[in-house]
Amino acid sequence: MTHQYPPFYGVYLLQSTKKPLSCYVGSTPNPFRRIRQHNGDLKAGGAWRTKRAHLRPWSMVLIVNGFPSKISALKFEHALQHPNMTRLITTKDIKRKVPQKARALGTHLAFIRLLVRCSYFRRMHLRITFFRSHAHEAWEKNDYDVGSLPPQFQVETDYPSDEAEAPPSTVGSGELDINNRSIEEYLQKCRDAVSNDKQLTCYLSEKTLNISEGNVALCHNCDGAFDVAELAERFLNEEIPEELPFTTPSRHIIPIGGDCPSCLARMEWSNVIKGVLAMRPVLEDNKE
């Protein structure tokens, strides 16, 4: 069975519009459908806790995505739901104690920051998107003084066009990319390389690449092709401690990313692997 890199799988935070101190953590491949389930707009789905009338309707205030697998997303979700039970979170780098059992927005934001910093998640190319301005403002305040975040971690905002009048089930502007639209051209480039049985040479070692072995990485910006292992080693060797304040590069086998050796365009490792995995279904079809 071919491993499929999920186009989108995110961990979201809901906030009750009736009781703002009540929040709910969940995960989904489709936040647009999921919030409608929580609010009862769709009969199927939802969760027992979010069905309580005194808490409905709920508003989805943010989502974290960019996980390399559904399993890693579920691990993030579970840790955020049960911060008092997880071993992933450490509070040694914060100036104020975070109440473990509090369920308010600010507490959840502090735990998200701590999770993003932890050894399991800090090298992933994660992104947090805020759908409500008050949640982003609370994030920026960083009330619990959590330390700096990984340099590749992205913070984005995507508010409704009229936030004050937007229905609770509205998810930002409605333009959140849950289908890899932003890199579809690159993924198609990878598929076409297999379909056309293109002869490729590694830019680093100049050896002939056998694309049927599934170990070829392509640059999104130029014609550069690379052996995946050699490109990973190149990127890891280029990482320096000043760029990675949490750890030592030599301890890792998976890079965060680097500049294309051919054209110097930035290559995020998560996208490189998406391209590699996009080739595999085509390879399997060619074998049949």
Curated annotation (Swiss-Prot):
It is found in: Nucleus. InterPro entries: GIY-YIG_endonuc (IPR000305), GIY-YIG_endonuc_sf (IPR035901), Slx1 (IPR027520), SLX1_C (IPR048749), SLX1_endonuclease (IPR050381), Znf_RING/FYVE/PHD (IPR013083). GO terms for biological process: DNA-templated DNA replication; double-strand break repair via homologous recombination. Its main location: nucleus. Its EC number is 3.1.-.-. Keywords: DNA damage, DNA recombination, DNA repair, Endonuclease, Hydrolase, Nuclease, Nucleus. Residues 7-90 form the GIY-YIG domain. Forms a heterodimer with SLX4. This is Structure-specific endonuclease subunit SLX1.
